[in-house]
A protein has these predicted regions:
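A membrane-topology feature that recognizes alpha-helical transmembrane segments
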Residues: 1-225
Length: 225
């Protein structure tokens, strides 16, 4: 019964993820338009979403998300046999997937899922799901955020361009709640190594960093268990 319940929960999470991804660009276009109108109300243009500089990309059929997320939730519960811990871990992985997908396709990271990841990490520390205490989780999150924030501004000052995006330090804030400060060098090394490997294979001139940060979180967590 619980396996079926987790399959349904995963399916609902998949549907929610699909709608969030599918509506991300239209919502962003509308938000930019509304901000423009507020700044220049006397010069209100007619909004044409199809003429916007950034357009939505296909994100797959909603049924695939329902099935994929449902199976993921089910498999996690089958092996873990702990309802709350499974739910916490499954939602964490779902957030990482959404953040990675959006950054890979649009090179954009919304602070909203990153903040959800942050609070979810704190909740996990409070429930003793992670190796960190609540205070350690907070300290680590601030440290991760600070390091990425400094890297962002130093690279912008030194290279006159962004080596990291603004969304990356918001993502680092969320990731920091899952890893100790001691693991920061290993986490960065794995993320950079993954990025370099994919860069060599793909040959793309620019790669988003968030997918590698998310993968590095999973790998680093597995190594340090």
């Amino acid at each position: 019964m619980m396996i079926f319940a987790f399959f349904l929960l995963g399916g609902l999470a998949g549907i929610f993820a699909w709608f969030y991804i599918d509506r991300f660009i239209p919502n962003l276009q509308q938000e930019i338009y509304q901000n423009y109108v507020e700044l220049y109300p006397e010069n209100r243009p007619i909004f044409h979403s199809e003429k916007a500089a950034i357009q939505s990309q296909k994100c797959g059929h909603i049924f695939l998300y329902f099935l994929g997320f449902g199976l993921c939730f089910t498999v996690l519960y089958y092996f873990l046999q702990d309802e709350l811990f499974t739910l916490w871990l499954a939602i964490t992985l779902s957030l990482l997937f959404v953040i990675s997908w959006l950054d890979w396709h649009y090179q954009l990271i919304s602070p909203t899922p990153c903040l959800f990841l942050f609070f979810l990490g704190l909740f996990g520390a409070h429930q003793e799901f992670s190796i960190l205490t609540l205070s350690q989780s907070l300290e680590s999150a601030v440290s991760f955020f600070g390091v990425f924030y400094i890297i962002y501004h130093l690279s912008k000052w030194f290279y006159k361009k962004e080596a990291l995006g603004r969304g990356d330090y918001w993502l680092a804030l969320g990731i920091g709640t899952y890893l100790t400060i001691v693991h920061l060098p290993l986490f960065l090394f794995i993320a950079c190594l993954l990025g370099i490997i994919v860069y060599w294979i793909s040959g793309k001139p620019v790669l988003p960093f968030a997918p590698f940060l998310c993968l590095s979180l999973i790998i680093t967590s597995a190594i340090t268990l």
